[in-house]
Each structure stands twice: as C-alpha cells, then as structure tokens.
Amino acid sequence: MPRPRPRALRGSSPGWALVAAVAVGAALLMATLAVAAPPGPRGPAARSPGLEDASVEPVEDGDYDEYDDEGHTPTDVPGSGPESPGPDRPPRGPGGGSGRRRGSPGNGTRSAARRQLRESLRRIQAEYAASAFYVCPPPTGATVVQFEEPRPCPDVAAGKNFTEGIAVVFKENIAPYKFTATKYYKEITVSQTWQGSRYLQLTGLYNDRAPVPFSEITDLINGKGRCRSDVTYTRSQRRVTAYDGDEWGREVALVPAKTSTPNSRGWYTTDRVYAPNAHAGFYKTGTTVNCIVEEMEARSAFPYDSFVLATGEFVYASPFSGFSEDARRERNRYAPDRFRQVDGFYPRDLDSGQRAATPVVRNLLTTPTFTVGWDWKPKRPNVCSVTKWQVVEEMVRAEYGSAFRFTSAALSATFTSNLTQYPPELIEHSDCVAREAAESIEAIYARRYNASHVRVGGVQYYLAAGGFLLAFQPLLSNSLAEMYRREALLGRSGDLAAALAPPPVAAPASGAGPRGTISTTQTVEFARLQFTYDHIQKHVNEMLGRIAAAWCQLQNQELVLWNEARKLNPGAIASATVGTRVGARMLGDVMAVSTCIPVSPDNVIMQNSMRIPGDPKTCYARPLVSFRYTDEGELVEGQLGEDNEIRLEQNNVEPCTVGHKRYFVFGGGYVYFEEYAYSHQVSRADVPVVSTFVDLNLTMLEDHEFLPLEVYTRREIKDSGLLDYAEVQRRNQLHALRFSDIDRIMNDSANAALMAGLARFFDGMGDAGKAIGRAVLGVTEGLISVVSGVSSFLSNPFGALAVGLLVLAGLVAAFFAMRYIMRLRANPMRALYPLTTSGIKAEARAALGSGGDKGGAGDGAAGVEDFDEAKLEAARDMIRYMTLVSAMERTAHKAKKRGTSARISAHLTDMVLAAQGAEYQPLSKDDEDGADP
C-alpha cells in the first residue's frame, strides 16, 4: 500500500508565497549581517571542542549578542515549539560561564535582526504547520502480523451456462389465408329505346345481378361447360324471370374472357347488349342475360369467420365451414338452404374442357347477387397463426440472471426470454411450428453438424421479447461429449446432469381460457440494439477482466518485494500496509508492531547541527529533535526519522563527509542541511513530484436489456387514414342484408312448399310413384300456373278494368239477344225477314191508297184483301221445313267432327225428312183458280 502523505501546513497556498517572501528577506538580512560581521572561523571546521550540547536552546531576546566559540548562531527553525528556560542546560565554556561576550552597538543591531527573523518563522510555523509527528516506541512482540499469501485471480463472469445450437425464429403470421374461389352470376341488362324517324335513342338502362342456381352450376357449367340464357331470381319480394334477347331460354357455351390477370380468369356467354329497333315514334324494351364465371383469389384473416373476394365482396362464412364434425363449428351466417357441400366434385377447366382426375369437396354458397364456390379443406393443417421468419445455423444461448439470451452473429441480433420454456400448444393454430422447426433443424444438422456435434435432448421453445417464438435445438461437440462420458464413467455425473437438464416447461393454469396468439412487433431494431450492447459489453468486460487479472498478478508479484522490503525497513512497510503509523521490527518471519503516538507540531524543536560533539569524524545521519508529548510535559530528546517519525534513540550516525547536502521531511515541508548544518526550509510545492502511483479505476458495464417500444400501434396506423376500405365495403354490402329479409323472400311461395311436399310424397312410393308424381305434378303445375295467371291478371288494375268492360259488353249483348228472341216469338216472319216484311207492307199500303181513290172513302174497308188460310198454312209448313233443314245441316256439320255415330244420326234424320212427303215449292205469284177473291 502507498505510504501516507504528511499533512500540509494549515492555510491556503498564498501562505507559501509569504514564506518565500520572508525567506528572501531573511536571506538578504543574513547577507547584510555577514558583510558587517568581523572575520572569523565559520562552519563545522571552526567548532569549539568545549561545546557539549549542539541542541538549540530557547533564549531570551537579546541573548544572542555574540557568536559562540565555533562561529555558530543558535536559531529556532520551523517546527520548533515554545521556548523553555532549559534548567538542565550544561554550562558553556570553562568555569561555568555562559561563554558569551557583551558586544558593541553593532552586535545589538544583529541581535534585533535575529529576533525579527525568529518571530517571522514562529508566526509562519504557527499559521501553516499542520503535519503531525509520531513517536513510535520499540515493538515488544506483543502484537505480531504476517503478510497475506498470494490470492487467486478470479475471472470476470460474462455469463454462465453457454449453450450452442440451431434455432428457428417464428413470428406472428399477419398474412391472410389465401385460396381460389369461383364466382357464378348472371348479369341482367334491360334497355329501353325510342325510334325516331331517322335515329335510335337509348332512353333507359337497368342492370342487375342474379345468382346461378346450384343445379345449373353442377349440371351445366361444370358438367358441359355451358350456361342457360335465362334466369329466375327474386327482387322486391317477387319472382322475376329474364330471357336473353327476349327469346326462350337455351343453353349457351361459355367463352374465355378477353383479358385476364395472373390470379384470375373469367368466362361469359355474350358480350353484346340487346337493344331492339322499334317502330318510328314508339318505345321498345330489350333484355340481355350474360352468364359470367370468374375464378379469383379469396382471402380470410384470423379468426377466419369470413372471407373477401378479389372483387371486394364479403362472404360472411368461414372458408372451412362444412358438414364434418370440426367444420360444423365454423361460423356461417347464411340460411342452411343457401349452402351446399358437394362430395366427389370433379372441377372442369373451362378453357380446355378437361375435367380433373381427382375429386374434391366443393362448397357452394349463394348470396343475393352471386353464387361462390371453393374447394373445402380442413382448417387444422392449412392455417397457422405463426410463420417461420429466420433459420439460424449458429445460435448461442447464455444465462444472465433470470433470463436467457439468444445471440446470433449472422442476424446481429439478441433475443431475450425467461428461463421457462413456452410450448407452442399454448398458441392457437400453431400446428405448423413443430413440423417446420423439425424439418429445418434436421436439414441443417444433417448438412453441417452431423460429423462434429451431437444433439442434447429435443427441441426447446421459448417466447422472446417482442413476440418471437424460438425453437432451439441444443448441440454438444463430440470432444465435449466424450469428456462428459468419461466424467459419467468416473461417477461424477451430477454436475453434468444439472448442466444438460432442459429448462422447465410452462403449463397453462387450471381453468385457463382459450388459447391465444402472439403479437410480434413490426421492427426488430431492439434485438439489434441488444446484440450491439451485448457485443460491446462482452468486449469491454473481457478487456477489463484481463486488466483486473493482470493487476491481481502484479499484486501477487509485488508481494515478494514487500516481503523483502520489510526486512530493510519494517516500520515503513508495516505503516504502508496497515494504513496507519506504526512501529515495527522483524521477529523471525513475522513483524512485531507497536502503535505510534502522535505529537503536535508545536511541541517539536529541531537542532541546527548534525555533528556529534567530541567526534569530528562521526555525524548524525538524521537531525536531532526535542519534543514534548503534551504542551506542559517534559522535554524529550530524540532523532528525526522518516516521514515525520521521531525515534527515541539517537544512534543513527554516519561518517562525516565533505559536501554534505540533505533534505529531510519536517512537518509539512522539507528542511535543508548543508555540511551537517541547517540552511533553510523548502516547501513541498518547490520540489517536483514524481508519482509512483498507478491509478486503476475500473467499472464494469452493467447488464441492460432492450425492450421493444412501438411509437405507433397497428390500430393507430390503421386509423391514420381518412378512409378504411375494408370497413366501407363491409358497411355498403351489409346495407341490403341489414334492412331486407333475403331468406324469407326467396322462400315465400306457398305453391313451392305444396309442390315440394307432393314431390316428397310421390318419391316415397318408388319408381312408379315417381312417374305418377311427375304426371300429377305437371298437371298441378299447369293448373297452378293458369290460376296464378288469372289471379295475377285480375290483381292488375288494367286487367280489372278490362274484365269490367267485358262484363258490361256481355250484358249489353244479352239484352239485345233477349230482345231479338222476344220479337221472334211475337212475329217470326218480321224477325226473320224484316226486309221482306217491310216490302209487303209497303205494297199493301200502296194498294190501299189506290183503291181509296177509285171507290171513295166509304169503300175503304171493302178494299182490304181477305187473308187466305191456305197460304197461311203453306207459310207455316215452309217455316217448319226451313227449321228442319237448318237442324239437319247442323247435325251433319257436327257429325263430321264427332265421328261415326253422329253421321248415322244425320242419315236417319234425312230419311225421316224424305218420308214426310213432297218437297218445298215456292208459292206462285198469281192466285189459283177457284180461290176466293
């Protein structure tokens, strides 16, 4: 240990300037005194042999008015204490005289100068001297000490339980599940045109979409590569049928679309809109039905309860829904009759017309505007909530306190986790982790480590900070494994088992909820910072560790020097080692020590000469001092030792030499002796310092772990935009589903329920029942169609008006028919022959008019022709004959339509008429002879 420095003089550094000024003034004064002094012997050579004591005695002012016998002037030097009368002072000179002469006035001047110098030195010593002196009594052996043996130099612990291995780093899978979906729909376009005299104007255009029925998809589109040109769908709670080109439905071939993308294809039936020409000045409406099939990419994100097509339509059903035990638990928000799963479905390539050789399970789901189909796959092996991020061939795992650190130089990253394993079973949809980790680790081990390392246990899983899942396979080199094997054979396998034992595995708490998913940060900069810090920490700590080890080795080597130095100066070595001032001496291989007593600097007086009275060839090696333990104690003689130590013996002597110069530590500075006589005091600041200390202040870097810190979360980034496309599309498409009952609209026909019930009834009767059922259902559907048509016609306001007009017209016709029948009954001839009857009446009126003129008015009654009964009877026979002829003609006409029996009946009627007599003959215009006038 370093030697303790003596205490500095009291006061600040400006005091040393004052000391220097006083010293300069004293030097000038002494030079003046030297010039004025009488010549005489000076220095040690002129020392009087009669001087018995060379110590500085305290004198009163005015005592030094002359020189002593040797030319020396006793002087109090810095560090001297209060003066005492000195009753034990031996007499100077023979006869016990004082040996002093009374001087002249010049001597008085010199005495005054000396007194002034003494006062200045005392004032400086009282103000600035602060270093204590110590008196170390000789050790008696009651207390002995020994030096410590060399210490073992420990290494700096940079970590423990380092393990190398292979690692696979997994991250959160934010990519959606992607699959191929086929969209089936028919696009209806209704156009209205107005034909002018020379131009055609489009006055209206209506577009709509309708889903393709399941049967048409399976039988026509996938079966034949064709599609029907008509479609029946529901709009405004009514069943609507649209025909392409306003013609009856037919099967049309699907042709590839003109353009396609790498992830989508399309087929259609027509690319023209039907807009018929109308007559000039009239409107005409035309309908176009285009059957479209689109194959595109669909995506579904966790928790996979819906998916979205590439066109932006949302389908609110899980892509993994189906009829199996696990698939039934998947979410499907549509009615059961709108979903169908087809087993043994052979997809057809509509471009080449080839069918797939392997069947698949096909899901079909109809929505209000389209039908979507996709290949069903089980959920468990096809989706994974985590995905492989990095495969690290060299990963080092180190244990730091309560954490593991996985460091990869290839990635320049360090991942931190706790000491407990995190099995992937705690993560939902994580079946891919074990499979992919095993495949990657097996490939790396077979390619790189198969000949040099062995595996230690199985794959271990840890959840690192930042949401990274690490699959770690510990490895052990073959040489180290062989050493462990030998240790095991020697029965020292306890530490080996503890070192190779895998960490504990975390288990879910009892009654824990469903499994969750990990959330991985968007950046890995924190892991890179951790790697950088660990790299710097390792480098710095290794460097400081080497320095500390070298320092320890240096201390052990210096211990040998200490052991040798204690034999030369045991007191100094013991004081430097113990850290306090002690006295010491060697007792064999140990040191006996004694405690040093501190002495105030004010109680120490130094003598100005180092010569031994009576022996001119021998001098003291160190100055002599007088001291008191207390301020009022007796004066004790001693010798100044090293570093302000006062020795009670005065036996440190040496042969006197010429040109003697020495500096001795006295108080807070140095005293300078030249030719074994005091010269002056030197400040410590005036002596350049050569330091032997080597400062070593080492501070190890503390362990620090960087944690991920997100400035903006995913939700904040998502909400930073003005529009959320997914939310806008979702709201727009939910509008129709939210305010309309689509399912009830599609199933509101009571006739359809009746027909479905009849069909199920006849299906249960076997093949014959099915045949009868088809006939009955056909007739029933016809009747229902007629009744539905009549009811629909009557429910139409224009239809009701037309029916009313027809009824009114029927009533008017019945009225006129009834009137005609009444007239026929009253006057058949007039009813049957109105023109003939009118002519006969006109002739009768003319005959009556001419007869009256000839015969006079009185002969008017006689002029009327008498009615002939025979003619009347003949007229009646004529009417009856005409009736029979009319009946015969009707019978013959009906016989031609009805068949043989009717013809026989007509023939019999002819026979009856022929048997009745003569045929009809018209009446002669003249009267027969013999008739009455």
From Swiss-Prot:
Protein's UniProt keywords contain Glycoprotein: yes
Any Pfam family: Glycoprot_B_PH1
Feature: compositional bias, Acidic residues: 54-69
Residue ranges crossing the lipid bilayer per the database entry: 798-818
Region: Disordered, residue numbers: 36-115
Assigned GO CC terms: host cell endosome membrane; host cell Golgi membrane; host cell plasma membrane; membrane; viral envelope; virion membrane
Keywords for this protein: Disulfide bond, Glycoprotein, Host cell membrane, Host endosome, Host Golgi apparatus, Host membrane, Host-virus interaction, Membrane, Signal, Transmembrane, Transmembrane helix, Viral attachment to host cell, Viral envelope protein, Virion, Virus entry into host cell
N-terminal signal peptide: 1-36
GO terms for biological process, alphabetical: symbiont entry into host cell; virion attachment to host cell
Cysteines paired by S-S bonds: C136-C596, C153-C552, C227-C291, C384-C432, C619-C656
Keyword Membrane assigned: yes
Hydrophobic membrane proximal region: annotated segments: 742-795, 754-795
Chain location of the short sequence motif Golgi targeting per the record: 881-884
Chief location category: virion
Stretches assigned to the Intravirion side: 819-933
Record localization: Virion membrane; Host cell membrane; Host endosome membrane; Host Golgi apparatus membrane
Glycosylation: residue positions: N107, N161, N418, N450, N697, N747
Comp. bias (Low complexity): 36-49
Family: Belongs to the herpesviridae glycoprotein B family.
Function: Envelope glycoprotein that forms spikes at the surface of virion envelope. Essential for the initial attachment to heparan sulfate moieties of the host cell surface proteoglycans. Involved in fusion of viral and cellular membranes leading to virus entry into the host cell. Following initial binding to its host receptors, membrane fusion is mediated by the fusion machinery composed at least of gB and the heterodimer gH/gL. May be involved in the fusion between the virion envelope and the outer nuclear membrane during virion egress.
Protein name, entry field: Envelope glycoprotein B
Biological source species: Herpesvirus ateles type 1 (strain Lennette)
